[in-house]
């Protein structure tokens, strides 16, 4: 192997991947432990899903997935988002469980080499978002984080595109100038 390439493999990590050591590793563990403590106090149970999934393409663009073949050469992907797997597992495999509040603290991966740690929670069978807001607020307060809440729903851009006869790519590509350029009186008043 070329000596320069060997040095890269010995010392560098791929762009987008994470390396924690010393103080940063300690801080990461403290954040995870405090978040888990607050979630458990609020009656959430922890779930750790497999790193690999057959279902990621249902919620993530295929080009963002890191894909492989399983034993039967069926496509699987590294987990790129925890929500879909947690909800799928909780509603299918754990449907008879009394637990309806789940949390997870685990890494997710996106193509080509992006790695982030996700702390998340899901409440099944409750349409109120207030329990979620309360728990998130408590976690943020614990870490001295002040935040503004933005509630989004994929149906909003879809409905706007339908009403204005626009392609969804306007939102996917962040091209709000297209909507503003329509010079709609009701929108101009906003």
Feature names for model-found ranges:
Residues 2-23, 30, 34-190:
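Extended, charged alpha-beta segments that form solvent-exposed binding/catalytic grooves
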């Amino acid at each position: 192997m070329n000596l320069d390439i060997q040095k890269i493999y010995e010392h560098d990590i791929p762009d987008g991947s994470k390396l924690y050591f010393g103080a940063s590793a300690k801080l990461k563990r403290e954040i995870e432990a405090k978040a888990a403590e607050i979630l458990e106090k609020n009656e959430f149970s922890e779930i750790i899903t497999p790193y690999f999934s057959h279902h990621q393409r249902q919620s993530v663009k295929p080009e963002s997935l890191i894909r492989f073949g399983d034993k039967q050469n069926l496509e699987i992907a590294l987990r790129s988002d925890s929500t879909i797997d947690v909800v799928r597992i909780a509603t299918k495999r754990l449907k008879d469980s009394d637990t309806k509040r789940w949390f997870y603290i685990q890494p997710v991966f996106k193509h080509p080499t992006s790695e982030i740690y996700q702390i998340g929670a899901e409440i099944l069978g409750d349409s109120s978002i207030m329990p979620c807001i309360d728990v998130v607020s408590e976690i943020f307060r614990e870490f001295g984080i002040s935040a503004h809440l933005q509630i989004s729903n994929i149906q909003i851009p879809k409905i706007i595109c339908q009403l204005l006869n626009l392609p969804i790519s306007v939102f996917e590509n962040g091209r709000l100038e297209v909507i503003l350029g329509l010079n709609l009186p009701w929108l101009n008043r906003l």
